[in-house]
């Protein structure tokens, strides 16, 4: 049987479940897939199919994640669910599964718990733009006032981490009832209300091709009689022959013009997000450009050296350090295509960071890198990955 062709007629959105252990994230994931498959077509997934998540590698780090797909009337969703708390931390920091929005699952019987708070903070730090709340296990709570109290606590927690608590959709229901096909208000209808909230509250993300042109430099050649060719994969936007671009990072920003776009040894009039291209640059010498810089639309991205970041430090078992590190630790930070040395400043209340921890740090690089909030990086020592991070806030 041939695999069905992937018809992308509907806009695509990436989401995922977050929240405290045992509050029902995986049950909800199964319930959404099952209820929506019944209504809009697609594959129903059982709890156990989602729970034994396969291992993947992202930036040298092993993460367990389950991927589920489902559709609503207007959209196609890819949904990630992680079995363990550590997997969530790693997933969100490495950006292995970037989310356009998250579904925060909170048990009505327990209210917000430590990981509820930690996942909201992580979502804020790594730049998850929208959160929708599913108040789960409402079938176990008879007291309406108690439900309202839990709802209020969740809204306050969202506010605390700069999400709009008052405007956040909160759907009450029971993932377990929905998975069993229950037609009462807390069962299947609650899942359809959640789907409606996903469709209306999370905006359709900008496609990579619609962004401002950006291409990390992978290699630089000089071709006699033609000039300098820079190769790389276009990360976002479109580049056309004759357009002016900037070369940003490591040294002072330079301006130049693209006089040719090549792909598979053929000349094109443009390259776009996802393409591996060679760009011919006018009047640029081979020694003016190096790995670690980016080519970009003028003014669209600036070079920085000083920023705060959320990082995950690999455990010994993951091939990371065997010992903690302290203030002023100086590893390499691998951004896009190259390593830059930098020093780490720990929060005032942290004396050291143990392998397996996640922590907020401040970094100062010795050379500037083109960066934006949300940019991912690896932390390396002598070519070996010892951590992963994401830029939370740019300082300078």
Swiss-Prot record:
Any Pfam family: GTP_EFTU
InterPro entries in UniProt: EF-Tu_GTP-bd, EF-Tu_GTPase, EFTu-like_2, EFTU_2, G_TR_CS, P-loop_NTPase, Small_GTP-bd, T_Tr_GTP-bd_dom
Enzyme nomenclature, EC number: 3.6.5.3
Cell compartment(s), UniProt: Cytoplasm
Catalytic activity: GTP + H2O = GDP + phosphate + H(+)
Annotated region described as G3, given as residue ranges: 81-84
A single cellular component GO annotation: cytosol
Cross-referenced Gene3D superfamilies: P-loop containing nucleotide triphosphate hydrolases, Translation factors
Residues holding GTP: 19-26, 81-85, 136-139
Region span, G2: 60-64
Segments for region (G4): 136-139
Record has Ubl conjugation as a keyword: no
G5, as annotated region: 174-176
tr-type G domain sequence ranges: 10-206
Main subcellular localisation: cytoplasm
Residues the entry annotates as binding Mg(2+): 26
Subunit structure and binding partners: Monomer.
Record-linked PANTHER family: ELONGATION FACTOR TU, MITOCHONDRIAL, ELONGATION FACTOR TU-RELATED
Family as reported in the entry's similarity comment: Belongs to the TRAFAC class translation factor GTPase superfamily. Classic translation factor GTPase family. EF-Tu/EF-1A subfamily.
Name this protein carries in UniProt: Elongation factor Tu 1
Gene coding for it: tuf1
